[in-house]
Protein backbone atom coordinates (compact mmCIF):
# COMPACT_ATOMS: atom_id res chain seq x y z
CA UNK A 1 0.00 0.00 0.00
CA UNK A 2 1.42 3.37 -0.96
CA UNK A 3 0.73 6.34 1.28
CA UNK A 4 -0.52 4.68 4.47
CA UNK A 5 -0.57 7.02 7.48
CA UNK A 6 2.17 6.80 10.13
CA UNK A 7 1.22 8.26 13.50
CA UNK A 8 3.06 11.33 14.78
CA UNK A 9 5.31 11.19 17.81
CA UNK A 10 3.08 13.79 19.48
CA UNK A 11 0.09 11.42 19.29
CA UNK A 12 1.87 8.45 20.90
CA UNK A 13 2.88 7.73 24.48
CA UNK A 14 6.27 6.58 23.10
CA UNK A 15 7.42 8.90 20.29
CA UNK A 16 9.94 6.28 19.11
CA UNK A 17 6.98 4.22 17.81
CA UNK A 18 6.74 6.82 14.99
CA UNK A 19 10.37 6.24 13.90
CA UNK A 20 10.43 3.15 11.67
CA UNK A 21 12.89 1.41 9.36
CA UNK A 22 12.15 -0.79 6.40
CA UNK A 23 10.93 -4.16 7.68
CA UNK A 24 9.51 -2.77 10.94
CA UNK A 25 6.22 -4.44 11.98
CA UNK A 26 3.41 -1.89 12.23
CA UNK A 27 0.22 -2.05 14.26
CA UNK A 28 -2.86 0.11 14.62
CA UNK A 29 -2.64 3.36 16.53
CA UNK A 30 -6.44 3.20 17.08
CA UNK A 31 -7.01 6.38 15.04
CA UNK A 32 -6.56 4.97 11.55
CA UNK A 33 -2.80 5.47 11.49
CA UNK A 34 0.03 2.99 12.04
CA UNK A 35 2.84 2.79 14.60
CA UNK A 36 5.76 0.46 15.28
CA UNK A 37 4.81 -2.56 17.37
CA UNK A 38 6.67 -5.34 19.13
CA UNK A 39 3.52 -7.03 20.47
CA UNK A 40 3.20 -10.57 19.09
CA UNK A 41 0.28 -10.87 16.68
CA UNK A 42 -0.47 -7.13 16.67
CA UNK A 43 1.20 -6.26 13.35
CA UNK A 44 -1.11 -5.50 10.42
CA UNK A 45 1.61 -4.30 8.03
CA UNK A 46 5.38 -4.08 7.53
CA UNK A 47 7.16 -0.85 6.57
CA UNK A 48 8.65 -0.84 3.05
CA UNK A 49 10.75 2.26 3.80
CA UNK A 50 12.29 4.23 6.66
CA UNK A 51 10.28 7.18 7.96
CA UNK A 52 10.97 9.20 11.13
CA UNK A 53 7.86 11.03 12.30
CA UNK A 54 8.81 10.93 15.99
CA UNK A 55 9.32 14.70 16.27
CA UNK A 56 6.03 15.65 14.64
CA UNK A 57 3.33 17.48 16.58
CA UNK A 58 0.03 15.77 17.38
CA UNK A 59 -2.06 15.21 14.27
CA UNK A 60 0.85 15.59 11.81
CA UNK A 61 0.84 12.10 10.31
CA UNK A 62 3.38 11.09 7.67
CA UNK A 63 2.84 8.99 4.54
CA UNK A 64 4.60 5.62 4.40
CA UNK A 65 4.64 2.71 1.97
CA UNK A 66 3.77 -0.61 3.62
CA UNK A 67 3.07 -4.25 2.83
CA UNK A 68 -0.19 -5.42 4.41
CA UNK A 69 0.08 -8.75 6.23
Task: Give residue ranges: language-model regions.
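Surface-exposed, low-hydrophobicity beta-strand/loop segments enriched in small/polar/acidic residues
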Residues: 1-69
